[in-house]
């Protein structure tokens, strides 16, 4: 006689709790084990000597011979312990003790036995330029694959939906409002996409957001399908699109590449079935599988607070099956799931891998990109959630980016820094090419320099979002004759992204090389005091052009340096000649007020220009 499903689930919950408690109790054996030194954390010289059965004086003498006077209580770094292990002739390995702070990662990294894995639907994100038909393509796919009576009933709040093709295959589409949402989740370590469909209009070709989409797709390291849209429009030229995309490394199969290109029309539903078939084919080649018979885990797509229903989260199940009454731990949040519904607001009893659903019952609103795990023991779930909160608070006190340009010499010498990732924004394509060429010639021993974006234009929020996805090493956004605005600067500060600004190529290159050699000059920090928009122009025969402005951020001060920015590009950098407020000489004009100024040796001011006041300070 079969056990009731309820009892089976209860037994599974008990087994899961026992397993978690066992992992938390298990201690990692450290010290010399079979010729390998095993450790979990940095040790003092005395602790290290004891574990390798050596007199502490031997280690102190080793450092004395190197000119270092240490004592037995000096804490050794992981690199120093590694060097000592090699000195004494044995290998070394770091093990991680399982704690309530990291148990979620342990559970998420659980590898299932192959025999428990079953085929799952692919998860697809459509990306591309804003006017190239992404929304139309999503709508056409939705309406072609759902029952007519429900075609208009898909809620946009879920952030994803699942279709069933004519061949009875399921595909999940992530419906993101822009590249930022996709990037934000990746910056939090959540890789949710299996395949990216890049949509490009046949009559328009590659546009700035197309380039951004390519950058994001390549960083996600997933297969790309190109859908050339609007082939029904006059002036469409699919071959031009294929040629343009070649310089980004996207070469069509017909030209000897490995990227599938599909020519179609979203609005007229031309070749949508071919697109779906290609997605299914690639998913089969990728061998996408998951175990549906374990406790669920996955990622939050979107979340908000509903005044009537409380915290509401759209989630994507990646492993296991999510059911009502499951207790979900999501980052620092947890709760018993009271209700699950799909994109049609239909009640869902069980959500299997690749299924997007909306859940109710968490005690707080989670963040997009947070990973969740079902732990069906309320006491344990609460304790783990509290531990996650403590861990998050500690991490927030630390700097997000461990490396800065000023200190990379030390990190390179200690073997901590292996990658320097650059985003380059410049005033002209010629500047972009010159910078890429010069940077490619830099040789820093043991360090790889990666340029993940190099394009024309002002430093934007998209650049900062892309930089935030880099998980390894140092990332720098370089601006050459271009500037970030106040919103971008604030976002960069919040995300701990370093922005460096230059107007001479060799100085930019020199700065990077000198930093690697540890001979970087004392840092001169630029402090932006304020920005103002030019709203009126006045001509004066004696003093030249007067720019009437409105201060949008900070203040414009009389003794500050001033630069003129036009469409994100610096057109002049100099000094203020005169500053007035209400036709009176002024020392400063603050945000929310109007003023007027003249600039020494510069009269080519235009309406819409941005005045940026700044000063230079040496960092102590």
Swiss-Prot record:
One of its GO terms (molecular function) is GTP binding. Residues 175-178 are annotated as: G3. CDD domains: IF2_eIF5B (cd01887), IF2_mtIF2_II (cd03702), mtIF2_IVc (cd03692). Keywords: Cytoplasm, GTP-binding, Initiation factor, Nucleotide-binding, Protein biosynthesis. Residues 229-232 are annotated as: G4. The keyword GTP-binding applies. Residues 153-157 are annotated as: G2. Its main location: cytoplasm. Residues 265-267 are annotated as: G5. Belongs to the TRAFAC class translation factor GTPase superfamily. Classic translation factor GTPase family. IF-2 subfamily. This is Translation initiation factor IF-2. It comes from Mycoplasma capricolum subsp. capricolum (strain California kid / ATCC 27343 / NCTC 10154).
